[in-house]
Amino acid sequence: VRPNPTAQNVMDGAKLAKENCCDFVISLGGGSVMDCGKCIALMMTNDGDLWDYSLSKQGGKKIPQNPAAPNICITTSAGTGSEVNAAAIISRDDLEEKTLFLRPSMYPTISIVDSDLMLSVPPK
């Protein structure tokens, strides 16, 4: 997952998860990875394109019919808070949009903060 994940990152991940009959997502990384994982979990259980559910200017403004799949967030960075909230920031380069996705079912099912995974993170 690249920094500032894209809708295409999400759709690729959701497609892979569906093709392999995955039941849940494990998001191991920083805020971008966890945001992408939350939206992958949402699209694993809902039809269409992620932007169908975007409230942005060019989004479809649809309400997801199903809750997101379970998502285990394991943070490797400090300060994003993505492991404890239901929000995700996703970009769509072709529309030049970057927007918030926020659904109660996108709260991580389990969040893990392991200090051993953050030994290389700068203190500030």
Please name every model-derived segment.
Residues V1-D49:
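N-terminal small/polar loop signature for handling phosphorylated ligands or for N-terminal nucleophile
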Residues D47-K124:
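A glycine/threonine-rich phosphate-anchoring loop and its flanking beta-alpha core
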